[in-house]
Amino acid sequence: MKFIIKLFPEITIKSQSVRIRFIKILTSNIRNVLSTLGDDITVVRHWDNIVVVSKDESKSEAVCDALTRIPGIHHFLQVEEHSYTDLHNIFEQTFAAFGHLVENKTFCVRAKRRGKHSFTSNEVERYVGGGFNQHVESAKVKLTRPDVTINLEIEDDKLILVNARYEGIGGFPIGTQEDVLSLISGGYDSGVSSYMLMRRGSRVHYCFFNLGGSAHEIGVKQVAHYLWNRFGRSHKVHFVAVDFEPVVAEILEKIDDGQMGVVLKRMMVRAASRVAERYGVQAIVTGEALGQVSSQTLTNLRLIDNATDTLILRPLITHDKENIINIARQIGTEDFARTMPEFCGVISKNPTVKAVKAKIEAEEEKFDFSILDSVVENAKNMDIRRIAEETVQQVTEVEMVSEFATNDVVLDIRSPEEQENSPLKLEGVDVKELPFYKLSTQFGDLDNSKTYLLYCERGMMSRLQALYLREQGFNNVKVYRKK
């Protein structure tokens, strides 16, 4: 099993020294991610590609899945490598591998060549294509938009047959740019903005301002862990949780209603700046988009920026909501965001869209800044890899079972795609399907005389959701784990 990884085009136009540095970092990132699949996978870097080889064919699907989610990869090819003797031998091997694909189809042959040979790339394409055309009567050559494209590469004395091409997510390798701190709320915007900075090469740490209790924190941790595990697990990152309820209480008590939204955001960036400074992070990332809500007008954004000297990045500033939701759907955070409550918008009934600096500063003079100092000082920092471990500790009161009682119902909370691809079949118990993102709104509609055993593939999501339901007052919930 061999994969040839092609670099994101912007990497290839860098100077020689920068290009080499980027390729080294990308190679290291790939090794870090693939190391979880075993130590038999080798990763070798070259000037214009990176080669991944494993002798274990059973890992092919897992390797493909991992490579499609590593920033810095434009696309990669799953290939077979052979030696060859001459042009006719190239045709014979190519036809043996792909001849059956062109029956009753239009096709073309595309060849790339590196090294010194007695033939050109065009000659290879014509010879191999002509051979296909002669040996398969139902096939027809079509150079533009054919049904089948036969791809092959010739490198010195090696023939490389391309079995499949997979698209990567592009961008720069994580670690080529400086670290950032994302203010994550669990909604559409903060998840997408975090992803966009990871894709641009920054290691993204997460800062969460808790306004809604432990249930809110559990939900946001799910999103942050998902983003890290899916796109950024080549690096260690921090998850910092700040209990912001005392700050909100002080704002509600002392700040004029119309100024509350801007003041709250200014307090958040002040706190985030201190957290960023503590960990040597260069910039803050937010999911703000121009004009989306009252605090996101140019006037208000400028006042929010004035509260700190730390750079604030807003990758979604010109995006509309529909586009943001589409990206969230593509990266897999839409289901989380759909049921995540928005707490910032509930504290002000008549927010100003054009705050005045003098008024904001006058209102902030009423604020007891020792409260802000205290919540930052007591902020909880954890390695994001420990979220799964912490979840296990948190839900010790939630029973885990592998056998069924008379009144039990197994609730498959995986996504519809996972349920369809790998149906849960159990004997002696009723199995119902309810995706995790619908639990908060539909669990209460279930028969409360039953005990529900939550099931997911790895157990982490079911534990988090069990704790979340317990927080809502549902005690008829356990976690099901297969024997």
Swiss-Prot record:
Residues 61-165 form the THUMP domain. Pathway: Cofactor biosynthesis; thiamine diphosphate biosynthesis. One of its GO terms (cellular component) is cytosol. SMART domains: THUMP. Disulfide bonds join 344-456. Its main location: cytoplasm. ATP binds at residues 183-184, 265, 287, 296. Residues 404-483 form the Rhodanese domain. The active site is at 456 (cysteine persulfide intermediate). It catalyses: [ThiI sulfur-carrier protein]-S-sulfanyl-L-cysteine + a uridine in tRNA + 2 reduced [2Fe-2S]-[ferredoxin] + ATP + H(+) = [ThiI sulfur-carrier protein]-L-cysteine + a 4-thiouridine in tRNA + 2 oxidized [2Fe-2S]-[ferredoxin] + AMP + diphosphate; [ThiS sulfur-carrier protein]-C-terminal Gly-Gly-AMP + S-sulfanyl-L-cysteinyl-[cysteine desulfurase] + AH2 = [ThiS sulfur-carrier protein]-C-terminal-Gly-aminoethanethioate + L-cysteinyl-[cysteine desulfurase] + A + AMP + 2 H(+). It is found in: Cytoplasm. Its EC number is 2.8.1.4. Belongs to the ThiI family. PANTHER family: TRNA SULFURTRANSFERASE (PTHR43209:SF1). Catalyzes the ATP-dependent transfer of a sulfur to tRNA to produce 4-thiouridine in position 8 of tRNAs, which functions as a near-UV photosensor. Also catalyzes the transfer of sulfur to the sulfur carrier protein ThiS, forming ThiS-thiocarboxylate. This is a step in the synthesis of thiazole, in the thiamine biosynthesis pathway. The sulfur is donated as persulfide by IscS. This is tRNA sulfurtransferase.
